[in-house]
C-alpha cells in the first residue's frame, strides 16, 4: 500500500536533515565540553541560525503537494477512534487507528509548535537590536528549554521508529505491506481515503 508520496518523503528528509543540523550545532554551542572540541564558534552560530530558518522551507514548499496537505488535515483531526486508541494504549490493549495514530498526531503538533517557538525566539536572539534586553532574556530562556523539549521529542521519535523496520521502509520507499497497515493502522488500511 502507498503510505507516502515522493514529495512527503523528501519533506521528511529535508526537515530531518535541517533540524538535525540545528540540534547538533546547538549542542556544540551550549555544552562547554563540545564547544572546546569544535572551536570556530562563529561558524557554528552561522550554521545554527541558517539551518534553523531553513528548517521551515521543506514544510512550506511541501504545501504544494496535495497528499501532504491531506496528511496535515489527518494529523490535525482527533476523532472518536483516537480517544479509544489512547485509552486502549494506556491499558496496553490494541485498538484501531487511522493513517496516523494519536501518538503520531500529538508528536506532530508538539514538534511543529516547538519549531515555531524556536524560530521566533531564535529571531529575537539573532536580531538583538530589534528587542529590548528583557525580551532577549526571556527568549533565551524559552529557546533553551524549548530546545531541550524538542530534543527529547525527536529522540523519542527516533527511538520508536527504530523499533519498526517496516514503518521506516514505508518512509524510505513510500510503501508498506497491507498486513503491516492492518496491524498498525487498521482504519486506514480498510479505507485508504480515510
Where do the model's predicted regions map?
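Membrane-embedded alpha-helical bundles that constitute the cytochrome b-like, heme-associated redox core
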Residues: 1-194
